[in-house]
């Protein structure tokens, strides 16, 4: 991969990690409201904890370049669920565009990983590529 691509992917990785971390933190800080919202769209209350944990922990992992591809898949699945359950009723209203962009960045990270300034090579030294992110 060329350096420009890696720098661009690094920027996507870092901002995506921050966004998901903040959203997960917000869900945990207002868990009662999060559970109520999940119930209002027909999801069981435990899913509020699952989604909040994926966003919070996944955000930290992606920010530091740990398991970027795996977390990218989890983020993409979470966003697909959100788009189907909430956003499809008004596909270009209510900040749905933001979810579409996050879905695309998550898919990009799942497909390409992110090697530049990532911690994967140090944590997963025995892996084939030395990096589960790429």
Curated annotation (Swiss-Prot):
Q: Keyword set for this entry? A: Aromatic hydrocarbons catabolism, Cell membrane, Detoxification, Membrane, Oxidoreductase, Transmembrane, Transmembrane helix
Gene Ontology terms for molecular function: oxidoreductase activity
User: Which factors induce or repress this protein, as stated in its UniProt record?
Assistant: Strongly induced by catechol, less strongly by 2-methylhydroquinone (2-MHQ) but only weakly by chromanon (6-brom-2-vinyl-chroman-4-on).
Matching InterPro entries: DoxX, DoxX-like_oxidoreductase
Where in the cell is the protein located?
Answer: Cell membrane
- Name where it mostly resides: membrane
What the protein does comes down to: Essential for growth and viability in the presence of catechol and probably involved in the detoxification of catechol.
Q: Which PANTHER family match?
A: INNER MEMBRANE PROTEIN YPHA-RELATED (PTHR33452:SF1), OXIDOREDUCTASE CATD-RELATED (PTHR33452)
What is this protein's record name?
A: Putative oxidoreductase CatD
């Amino acid at each position: 991969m060329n350096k420009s691509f890696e720098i661009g992917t690094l920027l996507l990785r870092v901002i995506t990690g921050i966004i998901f971390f903040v959203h997960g933190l917000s869900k945990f800080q207002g868990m009662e409201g999060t559970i109520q919202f999940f119930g209002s769209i027909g999801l069981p209350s435990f899913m509020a904890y699952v989604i909040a944990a994926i966003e919070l922990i996944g955000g930290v992992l992606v920010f530091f370049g740990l398991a970027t591809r795996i977390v990218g898949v989890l983020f993409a699945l979470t966003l697909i669920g959100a788009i189907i359950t909430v956003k499809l009723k008004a596909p270009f209203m209510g900040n749905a565009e933001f979810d579409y962009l996050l879905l695309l960045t998550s898919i990009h990270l799942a497909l390409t990983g992110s090697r530049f300034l990532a911690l994967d090579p140090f944590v997963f030294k025995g892996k084939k590529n030395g990096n589960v992110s790429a």
